[in-house]
């Protein structure tokens, strides 16, 4: 008997959805940064084992939108809860249910498929706090399963996989067994660069940055030559991203190259520039060019 199903992971921004997906896949597939809203696009990730295939839709965190990109991210996350076989609602024990959580719960109540409550970061919280959070959420909604985990340390991830297998239906293998992600290489490269920029810039530049891959060519020796722009919204942000004598941009390129080489399994040369695009997050045509395809 072979089983297959589509699974979506929802939760407030910065709750650890991408980290959980990475723990399940044991691969660095989804951009992980300590800052909220770093996952901007639905990424279908495929886990294939001998007797089942799980297709994960990694979504942006649900939050109140402030611009066109924000509207897209919220719609993307909400749409992902439709036409799936299982929903994982990820929370942190050290945070009481806020308006965002209550908003998600109201949507989950309309879902016709099993919903798991997954408590992340249990290794960072006392058992009393975890128990208190469980009780609070259990009173708000009935869940098919409640699983405490540590995505970062991999605790109870195998248990979570077993329970997901239990609830998904019998079905075909939708993707080849060696396929682990349905986004193209250019998209992944852009996400890796953006992650490094977010990490290195810390609080110096807000979320108003994107990465535009201008060229990605592979020569006869298998070496990739990549060129791209880091887009920012203000002229004042440009020197911050570049850094003194180009030091910050050089570090972004260096750290990105290491991960890109691991991803592509090839040697990589990468050149990056910084370009100002004012209010790019409200520019629908540019958002489509950057890969946010469902903009209207």
Curated annotation (Swiss-Prot):
Cited Gene3D superfamilies: 3.30.300.20, P-loop containing nucleotide triphosphate hydrolases (3.40.50.300)
Q: Where is this region: G2?
A: 37-41
How does the record say this protein sits in the membrane? Peripheral membrane protein
Report the SUPFAM superfamilies cross-referenced here.
P-loop containing nucleoside triphosphate hydrolases, Prokaryotic type KH domain (KH-domain type II)
Source superkingdom: Bacteria
Q: State the residue spans of region: G1.
A: 11-18
Q: Where in the cell is it found?
A: Cytoplasm; Cell membrane
MF annotations from Gene Ontology: GTP binding; GTPase activity; ribosomal small subunit binding; small ribosomal subunit rRNA binding
Domain named Era-type G is located at 3-170
Residues engaged in binding GTP: 11-18, 58-62, 120-123
Q: Offer one Pfam family short name for this entry.
A: MMR_HSR1
Q: Where is the KH type-2 domain?
A: 201-278
Q: Which family does it belong to?
A: Belongs to the TRAFAC class TrmE-Era-EngA-EngB-Septin-like GTPase superfamily. Era GTPase family.
Q: What does this protein do?
A: An essential GTPase that binds both GDP and GTP, with rapid nucleotide exchange. Plays a role in 16S rRNA processing and 30S ribosomal subunit biogenesis and possibly also in cell cycle regulation and energy metabolism.
Q: How does it assemble?
A: Monomer.
> Known NCBIfam families for this protein?
era, PRK00089.1, small_GTP
According to UniProt, the name of this protein is GTPase Era
**Biological source species:** Clostridium botulinum (strain Loch Maree / Type A3)
Gene, per the UniProt record: era
